[in-house]
Amino acid sequence: MALTVNTNIASLNTQRNLNASSNDLNTSLQRLTTGYRINSAKDDAAGLQISNRLSNQISGLNVATRNANDGISLAQTAEGALQQSTNILQRIRDLALQSANGSNSDADRAALQKEVAAQQAELTRISDTTTFGGRKLLDGSFGTTSFQVGSNAYETIDISLQNASASAIGSYQVGSNGAGTVASVAGTATASGIASGTVNLVGGGQVKNIAIAAGDSAKAIAEKMDGAIPNLSARARTVFTADVSGVTGGSLNFDVTVGSNTVSLAGVTSTQDLADQLNSNSSKLGITASINDKGVLTITSATGENVKFGAQTGTATAGQVAVKVQGSDGKFEAAAKNVVAAGTAATTTIVTGYVQLNSPTAYSVSGTGTQASQVFGNASAAQKSSVASVDISTADGAQNAIAVVDNALAAIDAQRADLGAVQNRFKNTIDNLTNISENATNARSRIKDTDFAAETAALSKNQVLQQAGTAILAQANQLPQAVLSLLR
């Protein structure tokens, strides 16, 4: 190796190596003080890109987890309010059952209706005041809302909330006021009152054609229609008023047949006498007779059986039993029809009932001939009968209220079931998000974080190299001094 003064190759080489070890030492110190292996793009360009992408995902997952927790809280708030609504509806139903009992007077039912009105108002108040984060949940304005539960666009879970006010929940009804017919047949009793034909039910994505035989009772028709389309329930009733008048010189005798059971009534002289004899045979006939404060006798078959009156020879020289059936407008007909009259030939009179259809969802009814109107009154698209409209101040109104409240409860229960399902869905989503976030964080750590064991070893190595390089540089810088020995 040449001996020179102007150029000290050994020193330059030592400086280069010392500079490299110094840079490595600085890098180790930075990694150990920050805890990150990658502090800038120069440390690992590809690793920085991957770790940043993972950081974005982790941040999004954490936000999505908070969003899902908000969804659970909202669903719990709505579900809690619906629980109170359920309690109110159950109370209204209890009151309706109490009002439907024949032991109540008109004044009793009016008092019960006052509590129903208060419960109706509270039901609406709950729907109007239930809020979460400033948003009303049960007044019908919420609709369907999406919750972002993922770190990417359109990763959502939807919550739908319906209007739960008293005016919004209830039953889609046909025949809610009832309708009936009275037909007289001379001689032996035969099927009469309802003509044969078909009633068409459309709803729930299905169409069902119900065949009706001539003379079918409302009970038989209801049994055919109950559950024929999704969510549809059918209830049959026979309701009519009866009056005994003009009995002179003796009494009236006649048979009453309900379904397959017949009872002979003898010595009937007044409306009260008719009511007493019917009630004494109530367990056999399955009908009830009640006289209200105005002296009006109402006879009811809660199952919708046909009620037949068969005349016998009586001792009265004059007198009659006349009935009024309920029309499709809910009112009893103005003109009474004689079903038993003294001194007449043997006849059989058949009083038919009506069918009420209820469903929490919309449907329609039509029929061939006169079947639909005979059974349901003016049948058409089902009309919504809400909880706000129920009135239990009459026995029939109480019966209708039970059906309306039952469907309202079904709607509330369905909404609560949806909320329970979405809460479980949110919980499962949170568990999944937490798992993904944990694994993504672990992956980012392996890429970006400092391995302290390896880095402290590198630090020790670089410190030794730094010290050795400094010492060797001092020696290398002394090499040009050898020239002086040649000059002596």
From Swiss-Prot:
Signal peptide: none annotated. One of its GO terms (cellular component) is bacterial-type flagellum. The keyword Iron does not apply. It is found in: Secreted; Bacterial flagellum. One of its GO terms (biological process) is bacterial-type flagellum-dependent cell motility. Phosphorylated on tyrosine residue(s). It comes from the Bacteria. Belongs to the bacterial flagellin family. This is B-type flagellin. The gene is fliC.
